[in-house]
Amino acid sequence: PTIGAGRMLTNIGELKNLGFEAALYGSVLESKNMRWDLRGNFSINRNTVVSLMPGVDMLTHSNMDAGAALIVSVPGGSMGDIITYMPRINDAGQYIVDPESGYHQINFDEYDAEGNPVDYGYGDTRQKVGNAMPKVVGGFGSNLEVKDFFIDFVIDYSIGGDVVSLAGQYMKGAGMFEETLEYRDEENGGLAYYTDGDGTRHLADGASAGPAGERIYNDGLIIDGVKPDGTPNDIILSAGEYYMNTFQWGAVPAWGSGMSRYDDAVHKNTYVKFRELSIGYNLPQSMADKLKCNSIRVALTGSNLFYLYRTFKQFDPETNIGSSWVNQAIVSGSTSATRSIGFSVRASF
């Protein structure tokens, strides 16, 4: 018999965390007219997925672009592992190139001896390319008071952890990044080629036209790798085709080109950010007395000012939509970063 429920909440597994957190605060200098305080904290955490409930081999936290990339938890791994399909390689560690398309073959399911796909499906062939969890997080700050003036700042940092930039994936496929100028012309490394009457491309280095007067293009490239039989790849692609097909939406042919790869959309997310700066002044006590106040403090404050260092420069990952740790690991449809500057007056009575 049924109970009329469509879903239920249950403890689905066991997670082990091992970490350390510390905070320090102290005055480095103190005199009649000056006081300097420093503060800082950091935390380290390592987690391991010990087990999942019977019958569950993998817990999917986020399924991106029809399975092209996933954020998962797998027993023996860490919560937040990022997995995706990767190009196939042979026993010599060389990329295998599809003999028809000229693109890297993606490791979906099975291929025959000639390198032709037997089945395009969602087999368990995705590989770990990152993890969403930072290794170390923390910050430090300083407060310096000299007579009636003060300056206070906060710097925070995050070390390790990865983000999946879906927006960057699509923009790279559309040729919107400076790096996609590569191969677009001869100056940027593009190969010269022409296309014959059968649609086959041939290298034409130094030629002004093909044998039959064909037009010469200078946006060619040959992907590194070998064909399934071990011969070097010699298939010429145009730069536009390469970016569009390699970095488009989706992975398996039913949901994309079948040549897309998402490992390039995974970026290290280590940063040091100048979070806040306040500069202020305590008004003279005589002025506060006239206004019937015990004290009056005015300050100019700036928040989310700038990065001192960061490894991921496409977008500000802190502007991602959603506040959960999963949302913070996916850059997609985010708003622009904001820097705020304000003026405050604080009075005590």
Give residue spans per PLM region.
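Transmembrane beta-barrel strands of outer-membrane/channel proteins
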Residues: 38-44, 144, 153-157, 181, ...
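Transmembrane beta-strands of outer-membrane beta-barrel pores
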Residues: 26-28, 42-48, 146-148, 157-161, ...
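Repeated loop/turn-to-beta-strand initiation elements of outer-membrane beta-barrel proteins
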Residues: 32, 148-153, 286-287
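Short sequence motifs at beta-strands and strand-loop junctions characteristic
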Residues: 12-18, 76, 130-135, 264-273, ...
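Conserved small-residue
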Residues: 10-16, 20, 27-132, 163, ...
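Membrane-interface anchoring segments and C-terminal beta-barrel signals
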Residues: 214-349
